[in-house]
Amino acid sequence: MGRMIEFIFTRVYLAMLVTGIFWALTFCGGILFGFGPASATIMSLYAEHGSDYKQYAWSEAWSLYKENFRRANQVFYTFFLIEAILIYGMYLMVQLPHLSLFQIFILLVNLIFLLVAPLTFAVYLKLQVHFDLSYLNSLKLSFIGAFLDIRAVTKLLLGTFLLGVVTHFVPALFFFVLLGLWHFFVNDIFQPVYETIRSKVVS
């Protein structure tokens, strides 16, 4: 029981710590240009130090943030732009008085890609920790990785949904704890995806 309590306390404290680092880095980027590199930085810190919260240092976080700033923003806003175009296209289509079967099919395809874009960015967050990728290779490998492990994708969708439910009832947790937990979750569930891609790259 004592070890379980210690484990829970450590995880919650670590989640609060990295969430605080995340928000600080996000504001350093003026929010708009801080979100992507802040997420990439948190993933790198967690991959390096795991649950050893004493090893997390602002100086290292800031250094990683500066390294990640350009590439992470490029990838993040690529997916953001795709999402915006899809949403706007769907908005225009639903304004039509009578939708044909083909138009309904296009709407369904758009809905699928609305899920694929953020999913692919989550895969990118995992892969960028381990690979030094160009912009185009980041997009290609992340997109491929999103389809390599259906179980990981299912876990991500369910886990994100549950965190969303918790946020709905206790919004403060999102700003102080849940963001950190989400990054830990992404790191762990996409480990098989990383290992699969690494085995292909090495071979």
PLM features per residue range, with description:
Residues 1-137, 141-203:
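Hydrophobic alpha-helical membrane segments
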